[in-house]
């Protein structure tokens, strides 16, 4: 890299850093920014006499510019040096001249906060800012419930940590913002930072922020180990994460990194790495600091789950109900070992909200098995080659005219090939008729060869329909035909679910089955609307569907021997009338526990509220368990639940 290119990259890095810190509006993904900083460092290591004083490697953050007052930290708040793989980690340890006794904990992806206590009382809260001076957000800090306002320690002390938003709360915040037609937060970190810097404290309060401590600033304590410091902080009443380790050597640190990385998706809050810190405080003091970092600690970063790429096109998919879903075609990008080439755009209202165009640079996130999605459009990086994404007029599959309802655009042709295929795939899926061996690819193959063309045709398949088809041998054919025969004996609620009626899912299907039996499709609007949990929209959907398909449903009854499960509810037990929430990994499926609770007269809810009576938790329980403890709801493990059931 030449000096001119280096200076250009310094300017670009500063532009990205100011957008991130001052406006909470990133112009690049973390992965892009980290890569740029590493380029600068590589040049600077080889050209120490040409290092620009403006380089982001030489400072913590831009000067603060905001409506909040400034507040000086009593001791500087440092950033951490990033390491990205084993070799970089071992190189850091070698520079620190330490290969034993490390304190490690998760690196939460949130906003850093400095709390000042005097005479046992919280007197101020400030953002990191430039490390020396932050923003005075004291009023907002008082709205964070899990920050103690009084502590059992009278000396002046600065307690530092990370403010985060739990993943579930983040989704709720964005759902609410979407309804209000407000711009969505790109990620929980931006949401946490934005929530701390609200002029209206009531907004901060409703965001349900959490504070996790990670260290001290000013203090007069005499501990010799950082692990003792953290134990002291937690005894003052601060939240502790479950994953904290003392590692005796480098290999143990690497093992802990792998363990924490495996928990990444299951943690209730976002993590972007693991903090590794020398536990011996005397050695930390001896090592000291660089211009920007402490030499005794590092952030061992996880592989990026969010990256920047270019949107190069849009494909249209037709669902079983006829709804057209736009899917972004992306320049391939590797996200945590998976090559991502597409991302959902949900609907055309979402395209308008994002103001995304073909050839835009976009930020794409992938989380677990969730379909990749676009979280941000970098409009400032447009080059004049971008093209609008127009709303379609014709179905991409059958070319029939589409019905544009605003948010949803639908194909109304019931013979549209994509609609039929997706309806069949849904009909045979696990939560519906659960026909083992009849997966998506097999359905598409059978439809292509006209072996199945309707839902009913599944039950007319014969051995010779499969002969000559690729991959089908005698054993496989017989297994599939046996699975189809077994599906004839399914429960009525599964059949209702399988029909794919708009607004009618598994829970509603069970209610219909138990309330009306096989006559469920011959009821009035009033009968549907009066069911517990049903409303006008569901009743209208049922009336319209059954009006059109009543005869067809009766014909299905001739093909199937549907069973109606009678739910015998025990009304004299301790569970009767109680509401449960189930979270974490248990020895049996959630459906099994749900069925047992309902049989004993209880109810199972999907979210924790003040109306919840019990939270049944298993291993790696997440945000629901945290919220339950905050609301002082009774939390029981599987063993306690089994004892409760016996009573």
Curated annotation (Swiss-Prot):
Protein's UniProt name: DNA ligase
Cofactor list: Mg(2+); Mn(2+)
EC number: 6.5.1.2
SS bonds (residue pairs): none
Positions annotated to bind Zn(2+): 395, 398, 411, 416
Job description of the protein: DNA ligase that catalyzes the formation of phosphodiester linkages between 5'-phosphoryl and 3'-hydroxyl groups in double-stranded DNA using NAD as a coenzyme and as the energy source for the reaction. It is essential for DNA replication and repair of damaged DNA.
PROSITE patterns (alphabetical): BRCT, DNA_LIGASE_N1, DNA_LIGASE_N2
GO CC list: cytosol
CDD domains (UniProt xref): BRCT_DNA_ligase_like, LIGANc
Biological source species: Campylobacter jejuni subsp. jejuni serotype O:6 (strain 81116 / NCTC 11828)
GO MF annotation terms: DNA ligase (NAD+) activity; metal ion binding
Keyword Aminoacyl-tRNA synthetase assigned: no
UniProt record, GO biological process: DNA repair; DNA replication
NCBIfam families, alphabetized: dnlj, PRK07956.1
Catalytic site: 107
InterPro entries in UniProt: BRCT_dom, BRCT_dom_sf, DisA/LigA_HHH, DNA_ligase, DNA_ligase_AS, DNA_ligase_CS, DNAligase_adenylation, DNAligase_N
